Design a protein with these regions (language model features):
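Cysteine-centric redox/oxidoreductase cores and disulfide-bonded domains
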Residues: 26-37, 42, 68, 78, ...
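Acidic/His-rich structured neighborhood in mature extracellular/periplasmic domains
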Residues: 108-126, 144, 148
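Bacterial N-terminal signal peptides
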Residues: 9-20
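N-terminal targeting signals for export/organelle localization
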Residues: 2-7, 21-115, 294
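Short active-site neighborhood of thiol/selenol oxidoreductases, capturing the structured segment around
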Residues: 131-147, 169-173
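A short beta-strand-turn-helix
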Residues: 118-136, 161
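C-type cytochrome heme c attachment motif
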Residues: 137, 144-151, 190, 205, ...
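Typically the conserved alpha-helix immediately C-terminal to a functionally engaged Cys/Sec
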Residues: 142, 148-163
């Protein structure tokens, strides 16, 4: 609905929802909570969205406050502005235009990726490629039964070859089922981490190859033997891998990665964290190059 109001010398156009809030009259100290409650009730937010209060300040509309909030979803931080009158009785949700200028857009700012504390990722426990102190650190949650993960890895491999000194890539196991073929293969590949970082990547690259993808649904024994052949041909310690399987080392690694991913909001693969910014889906080359300053 389009509403036009003339207040003194200020011409306002509200492309908005105009609401009368019951029961909040005279509660001036509760303006921020009124804004939060209104957004939660009327914006149709995705499940699990957190609403954070940022600030309250005078609005261009006489008698109203501009209340800035931050909507934290699984992958983004979305700033919004809610206009609440000083009695707490009236609320505007939407776009405020003053003399042809979109004031709301100016006040709100840009949507940003959701921030993730790097300490939560426990990167030191995971296999990686690239230098320790790289300009860009990428942590990706992935699994070998995911076609989008395969596509993401092919793009990532090209970028690692193009910028070998600038990108550190960390792999996290995230099979989408608690059991079954995907989980089983993830645990077996994770067991190679006990052998060495290099051993893991040999096996990782094989199962993300065209040949490896034809074998991922094979029985456990066949997969184990194939991994042992790869390790033996490359001169790695096969017994260390066998010990890792016996002690369920790979199972533990996968459980830890899944727990970390779940904690930070991973719900699908691939998902990643780039320099602390959460990204859902295939990591776009252009996005990564922006972090590189290219």
């Amino acid at each position: 609905m389009l509403k036009k109001m003339s207040l003194g010398t200020v011409c306002l156009i509200f492309l908005s929802i105009f609401l009368t809030v019951q029961g909040f009259a005279q509660q001036k100290d509760n303006i921020g909570q009124i804004a939060i409650d209104t957004v939660r009730a009327h914006m149709g937010l995705p499940p699990g969205t957190e609403i954070k209060y940022v600030e309250k300040r005078e609005s261009p509309v006489p008698g109203f406050y501009s209340v800035r909030l931050l909507l934290v979803t699984t992958d983004r931080e979305i700033p919004v502005v809610v206009y609440v009158d000083k009695t707490g009785e009236k609320v505007f949700l939407g776009t405020l235009v003053v003399k042809g200028e979109n004031v709301t857009r100016k006040e709100v700012g840009e949507t940003k990726p959701r921030k993730v504390d790097p300490a939560l990722l426990e990167m030191e426990k995971s296999p990686f490629r690239g230098p320790f102190q790289a300009k860009v650190t990428i942590v990706e949650f992935s699994n070998f039964h995911c076609s989008y993960c395969l596509k993401s890895w092919k793009g990532m491999k090209e970028l690692l070859g193009r910028y070998p000194r600038d990108i550190k890539y960390v792999f996290k196991h995230f099979p989408l089922q608690s059991n079954g073929k995907a989980r089983e293969l993830s645990e077996m590949v994770a067991a190679t981490q006990m052998v060495s970082n290099e051993a893991f990547w040999e096996v990782h690259d094989f199962f993300f190859s065209d040949e490896g993808q034809t074998l991922i649904n094979g029985d456990r024994e066949r997969l184990r033997l194939r991994i042992e052949v790869i390790l033996k041909l490359k001169g790695f310690d096969v017994k260390a891998f066998q010990t890792a399987l016996h002690t369920r080392y790979g199972k533990t690694r996968v459980e830890e990665d899944v727990a970390i991913g779940t904690k930070i909001g991973v719900g699908a693969t691939p998902s990643g964290v780039i320099n602390g910014d959460f990204v859902r889906g295939i990591l776009p080359e252009k996005t990564i190059e922006k972090y590189l300053g290219k």
